[in-house]
């Protein structure tokens, strides 16, 4: 399989570069900016892309690529900081710009006969997305300018003349961002026409490769998978099942913190998928251990430890554990930015493999979320399952703020069911990335039936996003919100006030806890 390496210098858009490449049918991987030529050779890519980054190539904190990558004979495209790293390496000059460029900008491509560029073939003068405070002020020897903007005379450069064979290109703007109107076409020109890559990455080719790999790794051993009914674990389980059939044993843990009637619904929709699933009813155990606990971090840790205990009871002869790890999780562990500050503990079965001496099978670790759904469709999984909104591992324990008890969980389940039901009936469910209700640890005064009430406050949350890394609050119609609020207050005993969360991520997170 032909591939492209993206070297990460810390740009917020690095994952977007990799995704745009895959949309062209080409497999891409993200590695740290410091990756050595030897490691690059092991990956055997057909091209390299240098991402943007937040530092300056001339500063004390400059992060620069290994100089040996420019001698590998591979086509290289530098984006924003990547362009500046190229100019710096080949003897050009990069300086702070007196006039920064952030947002949309118009670029002009040099179309004179002696400047005709393969990179800009079929690319009209158009708006692109800029995000830089530095710019190239002196062209390195053996390079030429192919495009300019109002603030950057050297908005695009490429090797030519004696260096033409190097096939090194640089762009000051971000072709991977949707605001760069013809950016994807430009990436296609680089990868297909200049690097000569033949697209061979697809959901089907991925599935075929994974099935072969899973069979080889698992052999005749049995495999266990914790399945939640979410997109990732369901697709992972079905993919492994396609490879090894009845050797796979799935366990669904009902912790009493799921959506209303979730356990029954999940077991029902898993039936047609041909999976062998055991339902572990552990509602009382989880809720007992959470009694009186208000700290969200403590709740997460209790749920994580309890999940491991329950899961252990179902491990017998299994040698492998299936996990639904996705590519963003893998990227985070090797990113230029290093380990991120822990905002919340992640609830997963990460403690199981080492503790139980289980080997991992992570069939989705090369995929982004949208690719997981595409693989699910190829596997024949129903759209209702694939398009379910994300649900936190600790479940409603982090949506019932404060201490958790069965009564408060039931109130939240009933309210959330109304919210989701109305979103679906109004055709709004698929228009938002995620929607849910939060039961707040406060009460408010109200009047119902001429009587004073003092009951719970509920918050509704709906966000729009592509990957959950950033999100904007969904601008749901006011009449829709009024209908949902009215139904909840009238139909759910214990709630007399409904609020709508209009916070974006950042600065807020999507979940409240």
Swiss-Prot record:
- Is this entry keyworded RNA-binding? no
Q: In which pathway does it act?
A: Purine metabolism; GMP biosynthesis; GMP from XMP (L-Gln route): step 1/1
**What are the Glutamine amidotransferase type-1 domain coordinates in residue numbering?**
3-200
Q: InterPro entries, from UniProt?
A: Class_I_gatase-like, GATASE, GMP_synth_C, GMP_synth_GATase, GMP_synthase, GMPS_ATP_PPase_dom, NAD/GMP_synthase, Rossmann-like_a/b/a_fold
The positions annotated for binding ATP are 228-234
| CC annotations in GO | cytosol
Classification via SUPFAM superfamilies = Adenine nucleotide alpha hydrolases-like, Class I glutamine amidotransferase-like, GMP synthetase C-terminal dimerisation domain
An MF annotation (GO) of this entry: GMP synthase activity
Q: Which residues form the GMPS ATP-PPase domain?
A: 201-388
- Database matches in Pfam families: GATase (PF00117), GMP_synt_C (PF00958), NAD_synthase (PF02540)
Q: Which PROSITE patterns match?
A: GATASE_TYPE_1, GMPS_ATP_PPASE
Ordered alphabetically, the record's keywords are: ATP-binding, Glutamine amidotransferase, GMP biosynthesis, Ligase, Nucleotide-binding, Purine biosynthesis
**Catalytic activity, EC:** 6.3.5.2
State the active site. Answer: 80, 174, 176
Q: Which reaction does it catalyse?
A: XMP + L-glutamine + ATP + H2O = GMP + L-glutamate + AMP + diphosphate + 2 H(+)
Oligomeric state and interaction partners are given as: Homodimer.
Purpose: Catalyzes the synthesis of GMP from XMP.
Record's HAMAP family? Answer: GMP_synthase
* Name of the protein: GMP synthase [glutamine-hydrolyzing]
Gene of this entry: guaA
């Amino acid at each position: 399989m032909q591939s492209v390496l993206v070297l990460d210098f810390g740009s917020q858009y690095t994952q977007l570069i990799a995704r745009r490449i895959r949309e062209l049918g080409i497999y891409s991987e993200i590695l740290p900016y410091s990756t050595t030529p030897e490691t690059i050779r092991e990956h055997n890519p057909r091209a390299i892309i240098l991402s943007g980054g937040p530092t300056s190539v001339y500063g004390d904190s400059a992060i620069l690529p290994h100089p040996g990558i420019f001698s590998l004979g591979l086509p290289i495209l530098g984006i924003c900081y990547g362009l500046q790293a190229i100019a710096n390496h080949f003897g050009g000059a990069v300086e702070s710009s007196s006039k920064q460029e952030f947002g949309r900008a118009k670029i002009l491509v040099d179309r004179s006969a002696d400047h005709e560029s393969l990179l800009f073939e079929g690319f009209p003068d158009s708006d692109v997305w800029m995000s830089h405070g530095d710019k190239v002020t002196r062209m390195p020897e053996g390079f030429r300018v192919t495009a300019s903007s109002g603030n950057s005379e050297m908005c695009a450069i490429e090797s030519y003349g004696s260096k033409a064979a190097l096939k090194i290109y640089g762009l000051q703007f971000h072709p991977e961002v949707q605001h760069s109107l013809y950016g994807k076409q430009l990436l296609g020109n680089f990868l297909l026409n200049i690097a000569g890559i033949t697209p061979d990455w697809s959901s089907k080719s991925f599935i075929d490769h994974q099935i072969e790999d899973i069979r080889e790794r698992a052999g005749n051993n049995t495999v266990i998978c914790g399945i939640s009914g979410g997109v990732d674990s369901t697709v992972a389980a079905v993919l492994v099942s396609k490879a090894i059939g009845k050797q796979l044993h799935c366990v669904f843990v009902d912790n009493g913190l799921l959506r209303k009637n979730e356990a029954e619904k999940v077991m029902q929709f898993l039936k047609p998928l041909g999976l062998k699933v055991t339902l572990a009813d552990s509602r009382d155990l989880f809720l007992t251990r959470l009694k009186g606990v208000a700290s969200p971090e403590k709740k997460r840790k209790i749920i994580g430890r309890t999940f491991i205990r329950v899961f252990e009871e179902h491990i017998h002869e299994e040698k492998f554990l299936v996990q639904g790890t996705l590519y963003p999780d893998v990227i985070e562990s090797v990113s230029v930015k290093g380990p991120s500050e822990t905002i919340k503990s992640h609830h997963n079965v990460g403690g199981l493999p080492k503790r139980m001496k289980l080997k991992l099978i992570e069939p989705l670790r090369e995929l982004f979320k949208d690719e997981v759904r595409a693989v699910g469709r190829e596997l024949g999984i129903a759209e209702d399952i694939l398009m379910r909104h994300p649900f936190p591992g600790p479940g409603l324990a982090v949506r019932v703020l404060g201490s958790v008890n069965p009564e408060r969980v039931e109130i939240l389940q009933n309210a959330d069911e109304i919210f989701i039901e109305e979103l679906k009936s109004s055709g709004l469910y698929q228009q938002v990335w995620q929607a849910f209700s939060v039961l707040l640890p406060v009460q408010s005064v109200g009047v119902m039936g001429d009587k004073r009430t003092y009951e719970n406050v509920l918050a509704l949350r709906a966000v729009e996003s592509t990957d959950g890394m950033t999100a904007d609050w969904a601008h749901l119609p006011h009449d829709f919100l009024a209908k949902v609020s009215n139904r909840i207050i009238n139909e759910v005993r214990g709630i007399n006030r409904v609020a709508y969360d209009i916070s974006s991520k950042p600065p807020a997170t999507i979940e409240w806890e």
